[in-house]
Every structure is written in structure tokens, then in C-alpha cells.
């Protein structure tokens, strides 16, 4: 997952929205506020800009009560809060966490893990080794790190196969091996409780030990009942030479009842007398407290206390304080709820905390070095990490392997406290003796095994019977073959399913393809022959569609067109005869094998299969569209000059394509020149292969081919019964010979024979004499003519294979490679005289496009400003002593928006502003901007016009008000669109703001006042300030104004304002303003009567 700062555009979008909600402060205040916010945001640390890195903590927190005692949410909260406050960690991101409950069944746990992949940036877990490898592969696919404390799978040690996986603790197997090697205990037994997570753990532990060459005698599962425990212990006693018993279950010291019962029964069966040593596996995953920590379960159960004398507890070494002390200190600081007692919390709490800190340390290293962190780089930068965790020192070496220290704890049958005996140094993988020796029952450890078990590069037989070993190997081989066969079957089924539903699906529908006008679907035309453009139909409320500038205007459908667009590329559809195909499942089940085989065909000279179209009763093969049309089209086009080198290159492409098909045991059966297409690079590709196979599989009838269609068919196939779709490799060779004749003479098959096609077919079917085309010698080299005659031999067995054809064809150029480039260069020399005209034509087109671009730029910015920006010059702010500004907005726009669909609001504003834009074109004004329903126009800038600016704005306002009186919304025609207009004159400063999408903006108190004139105006009214009225009266052009009175303008106090109601000579009708209420005001929204009328019409339409 790539980590980068939060896009600034998101902040701008939020800020603009806030500005619109506070529009009453005016544009200048809005701009000032925007600048202040920009300065504040730019000063914020990177964590404010960047999205949080969310860590998913995965474990069986709800289905296993002992796992739930780890309090994962509190541990994750404590770690993330400390990390986010830690000044030494410069992560560039704030850390967050999310708790994912892992089902206790591995299969369901994997399913839930997959469903969580979009909810987190990285994962701590899983806790169940049963799906660790799958989770790691998924994490690699998602580019999300998997940091596990429980995965024991030895396959995960491969950094190449699992680049996004890392362990936050040393591998438990490495720790066990270090201890076993020191005491020379090679023969092990593994026993687990019957919970699924521990069953999978047991099998992974056994598999990992066996991968290191150690003999694991038994792998057993037991419940809490006495019968299953006794049976399991008896099996261990019967196994050969077991020294160490690894218990994969919850430790009895933290409440594991199964282990308690197991040790009690082992004591009763006298298995705790020193013959065996019992090692709890789960204590390898956390730091078990032992310093001054009595355990009640040992004190209250004498039998268990005696049995525990045979137990060696291996756990992560604590530092200055135990887990309980660290927990109580955090509670005292208020970081953890004080109501939680430390002895009620599982030490796994610290492991979860350390894992989150482990990710933070890796991210800190990655950000320091690269400035960003992906999942793989997080794992890479988890090397050489050292930090103090919850109460442990966490370390890794240069390879990323954990080297945190472990301690071996022991007790005797008299005590209920644990004491340290050995320190397991994982950096050197050696044991260091402590102050107290291990107290083994009977005074001595279990008997040591041969040293060879731990010697690298040596095979230790260990008393295994060679015959038994051979039988085991054979059994494993049979099992492996069975598994491979089953896996192949499953993979085959998955491939079939993916053909229909996966990202590689090949059954397409109308939702996947867009058909192009049928005028061009009648034959394989080139891209250049079709001119199409996207026509926007936003005003009509419809989605954009394709329209064509030439040819038929008949709408393109799957029934009348063979050309379509799929994923941005042009494709060609070869339709099958109409028939009853049934549903999509029936097509898939009967033809999926052929679909898969055709999909796998990949060669430069094979037109690749894109898929199969099946919709609306149409079934078709979908292949890539080749712009040079078919070989038949090229041969018939006399404008294309073909020398022999060019022809031989096309023939060689055909030979290589057919050679590939025949090597894949794929007979074409329909080979002809029109089934050979040529792409834009003049590479010939074979297409329409597999057509007959699908016809047979789907049992589709086919129309009797015409005599012209049979001219490429081999004689033996022509003589077959009617209706049969025979095809053969030799028949393809015959078809190739006919294509050679077409290429040599640039004519149709048998074009030199003055006979109808039907009679030619009859002569071919009934020799003697053998009837074949006659090709004059001057059309091709003699050896090519000879090859052609061999290929159309009457006896099929006498025809060469395409391997032989290929070998002969290579020798025809006397050692020279058939290079179509040389031929094309000669063609270019012939056409070089036309290049100057072509360049001139393109230059003129470029100039036209340049003019269009400049015109568009001048529509967005004033011409002088646009010219300065094009030259790369700085646009200095310009002051204007006196201009007139126009503001207007739609009354009740919020209500209209709430009652309308978003596209209807867009249509409304587009229709209204299009109307306004047409009006301002006849006045000397400049449109500044539109924001939502607000429309801003100025006169007197950027081009000064003396005192005319007030008259121009006043005339434009009257025209706009008159046009709005008759304007109707398309979706709400019964609701009137009322606007209110505000005018004000005064000085402003204009300048260009921003580098990306620069805007021409106005600044000054005049902008504020004009906005206040609009916001304090009334519907269907032109609210004019005193300064504007003074200018209008000075001009003396007969403007009619009415005194409104003194109006409260926010930030300006009370000022005298006026209504502009007309002008002498202005004859256009103006809408009648709504009546003024008793308080002298009218509503600034829609009337209830108008809303009710719209709702009644909407209800009727829904009926």
C-alpha cells in the first residue's frame, strides 16, 4: 500500500463548500479566509495531511475466552496512542487500529480475513497458523504487510515468496530447536487441544520440525475428557523414543483447563517421572511473568504442582519489570481502565502491543530512508530493529529474523513460583546458564538422542526400518500424485468458472461492449474509415452517445453491426447462425473446454480471441479488430502496391500462424483469404479458427455454403456428405495453396478459369482430370509455384505439413530473411513526393486547432491576461477607479435542489447560465465567474469604458430580468425561477490567482457591497446602490428608478438604496415581483402553493 500525503484537492473542496455555506460574508472575506486557512494548513505537520495508517489486529477474540483476555482493543489503543505521541517516531501518518475477530475454524477465518482486506493498511496476525501462508500470499497481492506473532509455518521463511510477511517475534521453531539441540532431544511428540487453532498449530509445528530433519513420532489431538486424554498419552508412551512433548494449547498458568487435565493424567500414568519433558507452546508467544509472581493454580492443586516439575516453560524474557508491573503502571497513568486487574489479563496483551510498535519502528525507518512505505519496504525496514516494548526488548537481525531473548523457567514440586534457569540467546542460538539449574524429576533430564540429528548435512537413520521407510515414501508418492490430480481438477474447474465470472472472463454481454454504426459493420473497415465523436446530450437528460459523421445514421445494435468497442479497443464479432442457445450456463457447460483452448492460443500471427458475445439471442466470436482489413481486401485494392517481397512476407506470416495452430492440434477448417486479417503493422493474422468446433459442440445448424465459399475447400472434404463439418490438417494445406494463388496473381480463386464457381466445384470433386488454377510463371519464383502445386495435391497424404512448408519457404530467398520492412521502405520512396503535401495539410490542421485553443483560453481569461500567461510573464494586479458590478442568485435554490435530482440541478443551471451568456454577449461587460447559483458580471474592466459601465450593467440587468420572466425549468415547469439582482459601482483591484487553473478575480469593498445588494434584494427586483444611481442619472439615458429607502447592509450600516424598474425605450416585458408582506419583505424561498403544485404533478406521474 503506497503511503502519501492526503490530496490537497480534498481540503480545497471542503473549504469551498464551507465558503458557500457562509456566502453572506462576501467574496472578499471568503478570499481572505481562504488565504488564512491555506497558511494554517501549510504549517501543519505531515500527519495532518496524510491518511491514517490503519492496522488490523486479527485474532479469535470472541470465540476463545482465553484469547479475549488479551484485551486486544485496549492493547492496540495503548500502543497507537503512545506511538502517535512519540516524537522520536516520524511516521508521516497517524496510526489507527481496527479489531478483526477471527473465527476459530480456519476455513471461515480465511473467508473473514479476505472480507477485511479493504478495511486496514496492514495486519497483525493471523493467530491461526492454518491459513498463515494464504494470508501472506493475499497480503502480497494486496500490497499490505502481514506481521504475525503466531505463524509457525516454515514456508513463510522465504523472503522471495513472501516479501510482505514478517514475524514480530523469533520463530517459535527456532527457539524450540535451540533448546532441543542443547539438550539433544531429537524425538518429539506434539499434542494439541481440540480447538481448530491449536490443531493447525500442532500440525504446523510438526511439519516445521520435520523440515529440519527431526523425527516427530506422533501428532495427537485431545479434548478435556479423561478418555481422550488417556488415549493420547498411551499413544505417546507406545511411540518410539519420544523425549520432548510439545503441548499446543493454552497454558495451565493462564487458565488452560485442557493442559491442567493433561498434566494431571500424565502424573497418574507416571509420565512426569523424568522420562519425558513437557513444553507449553503458547508461552513462546508472550512474556509470562515469573519474577515474584506466585501462581494460584499451582498452590491450590498439589497434583498439578508435582506434575509441573516435568514442565519446562520457555517464554520471552522480561526486562526491568514484569508484564503485571508494566500493566499496573499504565493503569496508574490513566492509559488503561483501572477497573482491570493485571492478573486477569493475558500476557498476550504485551505481544499485541509490541507488534503495533514493531510496525511503527519499521515505518519510521522506511520514511527516513525513502519518504514513503509500501508493504514490502516495511518488511525490508524491519531489519536491525531494536526497541523496548511493553516490558521486553524487541530485536531483529540484518535478515529481519527476531533475536529477542527467551528464558527457560522451571519449578519443583514444592514451589508455586517459577524461576529462571537458562537464557536462550536467539542471536547466537545458544543457551546461557543462569543462577539456578533445572530441577528434573528423578535428578536427570530425559535421555539424549544421537548428535547426528542436529548436524548439518548429515542423515541420521535413527533406527528406522528401510522397508518401512520405502513403504512410507511410496505412500507419500501416491498421496502426492493424488493431491496433484485433485489440484489439477480443482484448477481446471476454477479456470472454467473464471471464464464466465472472473476478471479473465470471455463471455461478454451488452454491458461489456458498445456497438459501432452498422454502416461500418458490414465489412472490416479501418479506423480511418470511421469518423465518430462523442456528442453530449446533457441538456436532454440522456447519457453521452456515439454519433457518426458519415454513413448511415441507423443506430448500432448487436443485430446489425459487427464492430464494437470493448475496454477502449475495437473488436470484430463473427456471428454464429441464429439458434436456440439456451441460457448462459448451458453455453458455458457445453463449450467451456473449447473456450478455454481458444483463449489460450497466443501467437503473433494468430488473431487473439477476446471473448464470446452472448446477448439478445446473438452469439458471436469476439476477436481483435485489424485496421488493414482482410488479406482479400488488400489483394483487391489496386492502390496498394505489392511486390514479391511484400507478398512473401504475408505468406510467411500465414505459414507461421497455421504452423502454430497445427502444433496445438487445432485444424482450422475454414481457411481462406478473407479469414486472414492484417493489422496496422502489416502483420498477417489467422482468424475464425474454432468456428466449426463450436458449431458442433452447440449442435447449431449452418446454412449451406455457396459455391464461391467452397473454392478453398479440399477435394476430399467436398466429397464428404452434405451437412458434415469435416476438417483436417491436410485440408488446411490445400486452402493455403489456393491463398498462394490469390496472392501471386492478386485475384480471386480460379480467376483465370472462365467458369462459374458451381461448375468449378463439380470438376474438383470429380477428377480426372485434376482441376486446379493455372498461374503464369512470371507471377512468382519457380520454387514457389512448385510448392503451391505440392500443397494442392489430389492425395491428401502427399501434401506437405506446415513445418515442411515453413522450412522450404525460408530457403526461397537464398538465405535472406523475408523482411516486410525493406518492402515498405521501397514503397515509402515511391510515395515520398506526397509527403510535403501531407505535412502542409497537417500544419494547416494544427494551426486551426491552435486557433481553437487560443479562442477557448480567451473565453476563460481576458485576452491581455491570457497573452501574458502564454508568454510566461507574471500578471501584475491592476486597479480600476470605477467599475460597476452585477450579482444575482436564484431565490429558493436550496429548496429546488432538495426537490430535484443532481442531474436536474445541473440541467437547470446550464440552461439558465446559457441564457445569461447569450445576453451578455450584446453588452460591454465581462463575466467574472459563477459559483453555484451565483452569477457575477463586471463592466469597466478589464477594458475601461469611461462612465458607460453603469449603463451597460443596467441594460444587461433589464434584459436578464426580462428573459427570466419566461424561463421554465424542464423538470419543474410549474415552479417559477425568480432571481434577485444587486448592482454597485466603485473601485476594485483585479488580478490572477493561482498557478493551476488560474482565475481572474476581483478584490475590494466594492465586491462586498455588490454582494450585499444582491443578498438584501427581493425576487424579480434589481437592487441598485446610491453610487450606481448617481452615475445612471449623470448619463441621462432615462433610467427609471424607485427609492426603496434605507437598507441595512451587513458591515456597512444603513444606506439609501433604489430599485431599477425600467428605462425609456425599453419595451421588453418584466416579470411582476411578488407582493410585499406587512413587514415590508417577501419570502426568500419558494411559496408553499408552488411546492404543492410540483408535488401533485410528481404524484400523478408516479401513478
From Swiss-Prot:
CDD domains to which the protein is assigned, alphabetical: CHD (cd07302), PBP1_sensory_GC_DEF-like (cd06371)
Membrane-topology annotation of the record: Single-pass type I membrane protein
Extracellular side: 47-465
Disulphide bonds in the chain: 104-132
Signal peptide interval: 1-46
Superkingdom per UniProt: Eukaryota
Segments on the Cytoplasmic side according to the record's topology features: 491-1103
The reaction(s) this protein catalyses: GTP = 3',5'-cyclic GMP + diphosphate
Annotated compartments: Membrane; Photoreceptor outer segment membrane
GO cellular component terms, semicolon-separated: plasma membrane; rod photoreceptor outer segment
EC number: 4.6.1.2
Domain Protein kinase: 532-812
Domain remarks: The protein kinase domain is predicted to be catalytically inactive.
Subunit record text: Homodimer. Interacts with RD3; promotes the exit of GUCY2F from the endoplasmic reticulum and its trafficking to the photoreceptor outer segments.
Function recorded in the entry: Responsible for the synthesis of cyclic GMP (cGMP) in rods and cones of photoreceptors. Plays an essential role in phototransduction, by mediating cGMP replenishment. May also participate in the trafficking of membrane-asociated proteins to the photoreceptor outer segment membrane.
Name the record gives this protein: Retinal guanylyl cyclase 2
Organism: Bos taurus (Bovine)
Gene that this sequence comes from: GUCY2F
